[in-house]
């Protein structure tokens, strides 16, 4: 079995389910699906897709930085949104966090684990060794 390192940023809350915020294996960082939760797993920025997107990307940034990387190391994002009406607001914030070369990604509409959550993002990054 390939050695892996569990990545949990300092001050993180306890996940709702049995998973880690991030896993690093062989230079590849996998960031779990991330929602706009506070440390008690309450949704923040209710009704605000841009605010939730910013919160999610800041959380992902924290996980990757804890492992020694940066958002520039992200190669793929999986984006889940509850309604296409939020697509423009999400993309506006997303572009602020990825101003240069953009990672590959997909975006689908679906239900999320909490009704007030509007967006979830999972990421893959390749960290420098």
Curated annotation (Swiss-Prot):
EC number of this enzyme: 3.5.-.-
Listed Pfam families: Ribonuc_L-PSP
GO biological process annotation, one example: nitrogen utilization
Family as reported in the entry's similarity comment: Belongs to the RutC family.
Protein name: 3-aminoacrylate deaminase RutC
Keyword Hydrolase recorded: yes
Molecular function GO labels: deaminase activity
Domain of life: Bacteria
Presence of keyword Transcription: no
UniProt GO cellular component terms: cytosol
